[in-house]
Amino acid sequence: MMSAKDMVKVMVVMFAICFLAKSDGKPVKKRSVSEIQFMHNLGKHLSSVERVEWLRRKLQDVHNFVALGAPIAHRDGGSQRPRKKEDNVPAENHQKSLGEADKADVDVLIKAKSQ
């Protein structure tokens, strides 16, 4: 075994090495600008590849969905048949009286004719 004096000498030497290195848990060598740019480009590339892969999977799902013969619904979720005029009734709180609607139409027509 080591004596206490030898152990103290080893501890002092280790302390001196650690104190003079001044690493404080940080990397001793700083990265060059080209390394930082490379890492940035790599990160952008990886995120781009991830987006392309996600899009490819989504398009494949849509392709498979259509290939199975499933009907495609419109974005609003409605049917594909044209709507009747009676179905297009505005909400009651937004309805204008007949005079207001006619006046607005006349104003628009007058402006259009004057140009």
From Swiss-Prot:
SMART domains named among the record's database cross-references: PTH
Signal peptide segment: 1-25
Principal place of residence: secreted
Residue ranges of the region described as Important for receptor binding: 51-69
Chain positions listed as propeptide in the UniProt record: 26-31
Claim: Secreted is one of the keywords in the record: yes
GO CC aspect terms: extracellular space
Superkingdom, natural source: Eukaryota
Basic and acidic residues bias: start-end ranges: 73-106
Similarity-based family: Belongs to the parathyroid hormone family.
Name of the protein this chain belongs to: Parathyroid hormone
The organism of origin for this protein: Felis catus (Cat)
Gene expressing this chain: PTH
